[in-house]
Amino acid sequence: MQKLLISVNSIMAAKLQMIGNAAILEHPDKVAFLSSRRISPADVLKCYEWAEKVRDTERCVISGFQSPLEKDVLKFLLRGKVPVILVLARSLWKTVPEELREPVGQGRLLIVSPVAAARAYSATASARNRWILANCTSLVLGSLDPNGNLARLVASFPRNHITCLQDIPSGQENL
């Protein structure tokens, strides 16, 4: 049986696809939010606390918002005024989901797709996360599995720009 290998370059879109306020891409303080799939309930609460704190700041949050935790964080963020960049691991939707239309219309949400794929899968999620890291100024990790794909991905990111919420006592999350 032959194993199919897909190069990251082959799934990257020739041109970034966007819906919403493209000026958000130029924001000077873009914090990425990523998390390993495995996360303790206590660390989930830290992520919610962080999202509540950051949602009314001038920072910009960039993430894939794909996992259930990340989707919850997006809901917290959209209740505030923080600009948000949602990065898809697939090509853009034909129709913007109902719950995202208002923030897009208000100019607070930019939806982008750096990949050319009809569906999200492991390789496109990896390409998406690489794009997020290349376009942020700092990184907040909800949790980090030292043996997971995310740990390998963030290994080259400057350590002094990473905050891992699982390592911080509850209530003391940095913005």
Show where each model-derived region lies.
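Glycine-biased, small-residue-rich flexible motifs in mid-sequence functional cores and linkers
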Residues: 2-175
